[in-house]
From Swiss-Prot:
Record's subunit section: Heterodimer of HisH and HisF.
SUPFAM superfamilies: Class I glutamine amidotransferase-like (SSF52317)
Superkingdom of source: Bacteria
Main location: cytoplasm
Known function: IGPS catalyzes the conversion of PRFAR and glutamine to IGP, AICAR and glutamate. The HisH subunit catalyzes the hydrolysis of glutamine to glutamate and ammonia as part of the synthesis of IGP and AICAR. The resulting ammonia molecule is channeled to the active site of HisF.
Domain Glutamine amidotransferase type-1: from-to ranges: 6-214
Signal peptide region: none
Protein name from the UniProt record: Imidazole glycerol phosphate synthase subunit HisH
Species assigned in the record: Gloeobacter violaceus (strain ATCC 29082 / PCC 7421)
InterPro entries noted in UniProt: Class_I_gatase-like (IPR029062), GATASE (IPR017926), Imidazole-glycPsynth_HisH (IPR010139)
Residues passing through the membrane, by range: none
Residues annotated as catalytic: 84, 189, 191
CDD domains recorded: GATase1_IGP_Synthase
């Protein structure tokens, strides 16, 4: 990457920003922590982390004007990566709460069903199975990598084509990642998933950098000669 991309890490009082920031910086990004919509719009890419409850996350995003800002940025083509709860809030609704989600992806967040011997929350390492091998997050990754999960709820996309990866907990297959154009999100924590997770973060950083470079080239091409 010729230019260091600026990645905005959304600070809205929900999420482990320290680990995500360290992981992104290790992969070549300049990271800005911000809860300001204008700062997010100036970045080359945005990472939306999150841990905790669905309604709390939605409330804090909306109270800060970040919900509408994120929707507008995604629709404008800005690369966006959701992590854990940051994936779930992208959907229409959740069994956990009563507030509507951001609605960027159609579908609902569901709770794992109880079954004998199954631990909920799902905590620990699990294997990824790619459903969409063309998702930019999987570049230079082999299928079957192991990543780290901490969650009781999972997303159930209304469109099968939005599912980028899946995993299995007990007898239940669930969506582990989604990908649609510039919008990507994962249920697991890439910043805690060793080399596989760091490669995923690097792929997102490079995706943001390539979009930024393309925009610079387009501006130069349309600039009138001196």
């Amino acid at each position: 990457m010729a230019r260091t991309p600026n990645i905005a890490l959304v600070d809205y009082g929900v999420g482990n920003l320290h680990s995500a920031r360290k992981g992104l910086e290790a992969m070549g990004a300049r990271v800005t922590l911000s809860g300001q919509p204008l700062t997010l719009s100036a970045a080359d890419g945005v990472v939306l982390p999150g841990v905790g409850s669905f309604d709390t996350a939605i409330t804090r995003l909306n109270d800060r004007g970040l919900g509408d800002a994120i929707i507008q940025l995604v629709r404008a083509g800005q690369p966006m990566l959701g992590i854990c709860l940051g994936l779930q809030v992208l959907f229409d609704s959740s069994e956990e709460g009563r507030l509507p989600g951001l609605g960027l992806l159609p579908g609902r967040v569901r709770r794992f069903r109880s079954e004998p011997g199954l631990t909920i929350p799902h905590v620990g390492w699990n294997q990824l199975h790619f459903d969409n091998v063309d998702c930019p997050l999987w570049r230079d990754l082999a299928a079957g990598g192991w990543v780290y999960f901490v969650h009781s709820y999972y997303v159930d996309p209304a469109r099968a084509e939005d599912r980028a990866a899946s995993a299995v907990h007990g007898s239940q297959h669930f969506t582990a990642a989604v990908c649609r154009d510039n919008l990507m999100a994962v249920q697991f924590h890439p910043e805690k998933s060793a080399d596989t997770g760091l490669r995923i973060l690097k792929n997102f950083v490079e995706r943001a950098a390539s979009r930024s470079a393309a925009e610079v080239a387009a501006r130069c091409a349309t600039r009138p000669p001196a």
